[in-house]
A protein has these predicted regions:
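Bacterial Sec-dependent N-terminal signal peptides
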Residues: 1-22
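Carbohydrate-interacting regions of secretory-pathway proteins
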Residues: 20-260
Length: 260
């Protein structure tokens, strides 16, 4: 018994020593020779040059343009991916959900990405709660960033605009008033799976709503469900981004993405 206690104590001390070694405030010993500045300079490979947009919110030079207001060439019907996206283009400026037609999804598949998307509630403000300007952005066709008219419109906190639906409420409500355009700027990290199909580590997401941080690198706890608890039922790779038809004439414009 005493021997077991002694071993346990030594293991605990060893763990503390190891932790201190890993996170020491002292610089590592690299050489008996004095350090020079150039010894810690990394020159190759050079960092890729990307030209930023002249207008904040517009696409940088390496972005994939998913929607520019002119056509839906990058999208297909979610009901039948062999058919064109059934939503309508308005004034060569934005697209509008056609209620009952079903969601739409990208032709391309994505994993880790930076996404910019702008949206507006329907022109006519009606209904309340989840019935007002409802839609959603689904990453890898599974994990929903909620779209809702949350301006003076109370609903459950993990279901309002900029929530990771029924998973994480936003840090604040940064919704603009009706008829104004809103923007999401998102950094999404896809989940990773082991060779046997089990989860290695979950998806994570950071969201800025109209320039305001509302999701700070939060863990996505699994598949978005209306009823039930979040989980990761199966392994998957890159997949489409989809926009939800929730029966409201929600509008979208200026959608672009950068693969990360």
């Amino acid at each position: 018994m005493k021997k077991n206690l002694w071993i346990t104590a030594m293991l605990a001390v060893g763990s503390v020593v190891l932790a201190k070694a890993q996170y020491s405030s002292k610089p590592p010993e690299v050489s008996p020779a004095p350090m020079k500045p150039e010894m810690t300079e990394i020159w190759e490979p050079e960092v890729k040059v990307v030209t930023p947009a002249k207008v904040l919110g517009d696409a940088p030079s390496d972005a994939i343009i998913l929607f520019n207001g002119k056509n839906l060439d990058q999208w297909v019907s979610q009901k039948d991916a062999t058919k064109p996206a059934p939503w309508k283009i308005v004034n060569n400026d934005h697209m509008e959900v056609v209620p009952g037609s079903g969601g739409i999804q990208t032709k391309m598949k994505f994993g880790d990405c930076q996404l910019h998307i702008e949206f507006s509630a329907p022109d006519v403000v009606e209904s309340e709660g989840q019935g007002r300007g409802n839609s959603g952005v689904f990453f890898q066709n599974r994990y929903e960033l909620q779209i809702l008219d949350s301006y003076n419109n109370r609903t459950y906190r993990n279901g309002q605009a900029a929530s990771i639906y029924k998973d994480h409420a936003p840090l604040v409500n940064a919704m603009r008033s009706p008829l104004e355009w809103n923007s999401y700027d998102v950094v999404y990290t896809a989940p990773r799976f082991k060779a046997d199909g089990s989860l290695d580590y979950p998806a994570r997401i950071t969201v800025f709503h109209n320039g305001v941080l509302v999701q700070n690198n939060v863990t996505i706890n699994g598949l978005t469900l209306y009823i039930g608890l979040h989980h990761y039922p199966e392994a998957h790779g890159e997949d489409v981004i989809s926009l939800q038809d929730h029966g409201n004439k929600t509008q979208f414009r200026n959608i672009w993405l950068r693969k990360l």
